[in-house]
Design a protein with these regions (language model features):
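Short, conserved acidic/polar surface loops in the N-terminal third of protein domains
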Residues: 86-90
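N-terminal amphipathic, basic helical "cap/leader" segment at the start of enzyme domains
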Residues: 1-74, 80-81, 85
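Small-aliphatic-rich amphipathic alpha-helix that forms the alpha element of a beta-alpha
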Residues: 33, 76, 91-118
């Protein structure tokens, strides 16, 4: 898939095929997220891949907009580590970049999955 095609055709998916994702494919997708740019190259994230069906069904009790996750082959949770993240204090404000860094990694992850037909 060409980059522009992926950018212009990517969409949010809430209905999933009943088909597992190969471990090698999942590792390639995670690698794409790990190559995302971050503030000062801190890479303040961890990626948790959850494929346990019972746990996925319970996610709806943790986060209210995740009821569709029970039907997914897996869910990747992107966790940001505030200790690793770059931050800057300026006057009376503290600027942190963890949300931006994790959002960029998540977008890379979604585009990599989309490019592989997932």
């Amino acid at each position: 898939m060409e980059l522009m095609e992926g950018l212009l055709t990517r969409r949010s998916v809430r209905k999933y095929q009943d088909k597992p994702i190969e471990r090698e494919t999942m590792m390639e997708i995670i690698k794409a997220a790990q190559y995302s740019p971050t503030a000062h190259n801190r890479q303040p994230w961890e990626f948790l891949v959850i494929d346990d069906r019972e746990f996925l069904a319970e996610l709806r009790h943790i986060q209210r907009w995740t009821s569709f996750a029970k039907d997914a082959a897996c869910v990747v949770i992107v966790c940001g580590d505030t200790e690793k993240s770059f931050s800057r204090s300026k006057e009376d404000e503290k600027w942190t970049f963890i949300d931006v860094d994790c959002a960029i990694a998540t977008e890379n992850l979604m585009l990599a999955a989309w490019a592989r037909g997932i």
